[in-house]
Amino acid sequence: MRLRSRTAVVSAAALAGVLAVTTVAPAAAGEGPRAASSSKGHESRDKHGLRVATYNASLNRGEQGQLLRDLSTPDNQQARNIAQVIQINDPDIVLLNEFDYVPGGRAARAFRDNYLAVSQNGHAPVDYPYHYVAPVNTGVPSGLDLNQDGTVGGPDDAWGFGLFPGQYGMVIYSKYPIARDRVRTFQHFRWQDMPGNRLPTDYYTPEQAAQLRLSSKSHWDVPVRVGHKTVHVLAAHPTPPSFDGPEDRNGRRNNDEIRFWADYITGTKSARYIYDDAGRRGGLPRGERFVIVGDYNSDPNDGDSFPGAARQLLDNSRVHDPQPTSTGAVVASARQGGANRTHVTRPALDTADFSDDPAPGNLRVDYALPSKNLPLLDAGVFWPAPGRPGSELTGEYPFPTSDHSLVWVDVKVPGRR
């Protein structure tokens, strides 16, 4: 990823495309046995569990307001393809990364009403009565020269890289009520306030270091009421560990953005330093149920990540890693070659189709990680092998949807009524 320019990433993201369908390892790879494509499938799942998904949908644009214009009518092809992927997998709750923030939730409602609620290519519409959007740090001017180029302004000097405020934002859609009065956001949490942080000591000025925000977008704790129980959707989209220099400022930030959730879910002293945007301190109380979702831009073994970054969640004692796989990822890795040939992570676990030669190759960067007190039922990655149903929604650059796959997990909510 270090070999891509920021310009290339912005333009590619506007086109991008998704991937495949699978089952929990070590079950046989293929189309997930409960990847619902109809309301009947959802009714069946109601008896067994809750499906939570994450999808970097690449619904970002290079100009402020363009996404809202694209979604205001039902004929944007990329949006139709994204909606079809969601309809095929029919999650009860889904986080979309790289969905430009528009104040008032207008873009979120437009995508829901004009695309998700409309049958795409014969698939049953999905109804999401509830959604959550909030401001993010991308594109918000910092007033500081954060890239040390001698000038103040531009995407690299924003609190999170972005051409305009809200670019690369997030939205959560839910079939179940969101407890809005209990939502916590951490957009303004300062990086230096994390004990033992990896903030570069020889790159930022003291003035800059004192003001830097940790989240490149934001961190959200969104409680969802499932029957009489609550499941916390912990959503984020850490910065890519690339596009920097030997100081590794983005790799270090990515590591600490991931660590934030690892500390937050402990429910112990290690979370006392945390404060939210309303000033409330502390992490998630022990015993609470959660699913960590998002594009974390970190593979546990490959790519440019700071050593051990993803392992902070994958090896966490409170987290269950379902290790979802897909057949499409295996085929893509073998056919594309390049950096994929030397990867340590099994190709079946990949969730994103990145440049292969010279680097970084396809990676596992998108996660849906439930707490261990949510019994795991199934999980998958929507990346069908060529010729399988849905494979027309995937492909190589320019992608019909996104360069990331939708990742889902089915969990049982104990005592749900």
Model-derived regions, located:
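N-terminal export and membrane-targeting signals
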Residues: M1-A14
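N-terminal, active-site-proximal structural segment of metallo-dependent hydrolase catalytic domains
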Residues: T7, V21-M170, P200-L212, G227-V231, ...
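Conserved hydrophobic/aromatic beta-strand scaffold that supports enzyme active sites
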Residues: T54, M170-I172, H219-P223, A235, ...
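Active-site metal-binding loops of divalent metal-dependent hydrolases
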Residues: A57, E98-F99, Y176, P238, ...
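A substrate-binding/cap region within the structured catalytic cores of diverse enzymes
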Residues: P155-G196, S216-S218
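Metal-dependent phosphoester-hydrolase catalytic domains
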Residues: P177-T185, D193-M194, P223-V224, R252-I258, ...
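Short, structured patches in soluble enzyme cores that scaffold and shape functional sites
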Residues: T185-Q187, V224-V226, A235-P238
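Active-site His/acidic residue clusters
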Residues: V231-R252
